[in-house]
Amino acid sequence: MDRGIYLSNRLTFQVFLKEVWKHLRLPPPTPIQLDIADYIGDPQKSPRRAIVEAFRGVGKSYITSAYVCYRLLLNPDIKCLVVSASKVRADDFSTFTQRLIKEMPILEELIPREGQRDSKISFDVGPTKAAHAPSVKSIGITGQLSGSRADLIIADDIEIPSNSQTQMMREKLGESIKEFDAVLSPGGQVIFLGTPQCEQTIYDILPSRGYEMRIWPARFPLEAQRDKYLGRISPFINEMVDKAGMNPGEPTDPLRFSEEDLIERELSYGKSGFALQFMLDTSLSDMDRYPLKISDLIVMDLNTDTAPETLVFQRAPYLQNDEIPMVGLHGDKWYRPLDIGGKWIPYEGSVLAVDPSGRGRDETSWCVVKMLGGNLFLVAQGGIQGGYSDEVMG
């Protein structure tokens, strides 16, 4: 294909991706891969702050590495910063990008010239003007981001189990991500690539910071599961079910993973791990990992002496109680009763439970639970500081 066609700025990234796949001797890009390319591949229409959440093995990094080449082909003066959880991972991304430039005939004019930077961690492209920042640079998320400048930031798998196990780790990671705003040039683009590693993943926080998330799960979600994704599933996935007649539960990309392959991986990963890594469903992971949930409780006004004979419970969206602050895990909700039936009659029993604190900073907690008809009613609770002193226990 003549290089002049590329430089006309009329060639879509999807077509360029097909040329890259052909050079790598890979099968043609799958519909899912082309949909991801369409989401990130138009510098004018694509989100300036995008999150690509797609199942493991779909080729997110390969696609985005080709996108870096595509952007450099259209404008050799842009600067790209590749950030990953580990420096090695970021270097692998930039090395692959560099090899594409040196091996594909259509990219030969981007090959670094004599006197330009030419290493796997930092390199220039041939036509670029002299600048402090290299055309492509790789760095770890804990490295020195300050001082860098970039028109395109690729955050490739910045969340891994070793840096997201605790709330403190996730907060530290979130602060590191804020540095992107200081690095990004005006009008620049940030693309996050990854899969959630925990139920309180940093990716779920980023939309509140102005990022747009799009999700490509490994299976078409059931109708009841769609709400859990908060409208972030790719429209292409939804259209395949609503208009093309695909059945929920079938593989979204059978050319990559067949149903048999997904079943084997689900058995190997476990339901919770598969939900995170392949279905990108953090709420399902919470339900599997934590048997006691706030959504198991019924929130209602109670009397200290009597209670209704029957209560009907249902987790329906219109029964959610949003007036009470949610202090549970992401995706959990408070629910009102669906129906209150029968007469209000006296409780059958009452228990006062006390959990004394140690000598640390925790509190002595207490609660009063009353019983009626197989239901337990929490009518009072509280906490007192002071350990187990006479004043507290009295």
Per-region residue spans from a language model:
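N-terminal accessory segments
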Residues: M1-R48
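Walker A/P-loop
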Residues: P47-A66
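Walker A/P-loop NTP-binding motif
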Residues: T64-N75
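Conserved nucleotide-state-sensing and coupling region of NTP-binding domains
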Residues: V83-L145
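Conserved RecA-like ASCE ATPase "motif II neighborhood" in helicase/translocase motors
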Residues: I121-K178
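RNase H-like, metal-dependent nuclease domains and their acidic two-metal-ion catalytic environment used
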Residues: D151, L193, E199-D204, R256, ...
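Conserved P-loop NTPase catalytic core
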Residues: I202-Y290
